[in-house]
From Swiss-Prot:
Family: Belongs to the Turandot family.
Organism annotation: Drosophila simulans (Fruit fly)
Subcellular location: Secreted
Signal sequence region: 1-22
Gene Ontology cellular component terms for the protein in this record: extracellular space
Name the UniProt record assigns to this protein: Protein Turandot F
Domain of life per record: Eukaryota
UniProt KW Signal keyword: yes
Length: 125
């Protein structure tokens, strides 16, 4: 009897894990395609890309484990995210600093390209 209960519990657990995995895939694919549409398209202007940088950072932080990046690219991306967060958290006279998007864009452009390549590989898999 114990083995039947244990086996049933195992089947329920596997079913829950599979259902959770299936629910995340459409969200990942949808967001990945959005990031590719903005950052993987050479016709998208710089302003649009810079406006979508926070979304790319959020995407990377949420799905970095699912992106097939080299160790070097992953280390670089983590450093860039940390520097980006530090820059955004700077305060001048008690309020967030204004401007500086050009610097942030220049800092994040190589990061964006490596992430876009990782996203494209992840979608193909």
């Amino acid at each position: 009897m114990k083995t039947v209960i244990l086996f049933s519990f195992l089947l329920v657990l596997l079913g829950c894990l599979e259902a959770g995995h299936a629910q995340r895939d459409p969200e990942f694919s949808s967001k990945a395609r959005q990031m590719l549409a903005v950052f993987g398209n050479s016709e998208v202007d710089r302003y649009t890309k810079s406006r979508n940088l926070p979304a790319l950072i959020e995407f990377y932080e949420k799905y970095s484990s699912r992106l097939p990046l080299t160790v070097q690219d992953r280390t670089y991306a983590n450093n860039v995210v940390r520097r980006y967060r530090a820059q955004n958290n700077q305060q001048v006279d008690g309020v967030p600093a204004q401007g500086g998007i050009g610097l942030a864009f220049a800092l994040l452009l190589p990061f964006a390209m490596s992430i876009v390549e990782g996203i494209a590989k992840a979608i193909r898999e």
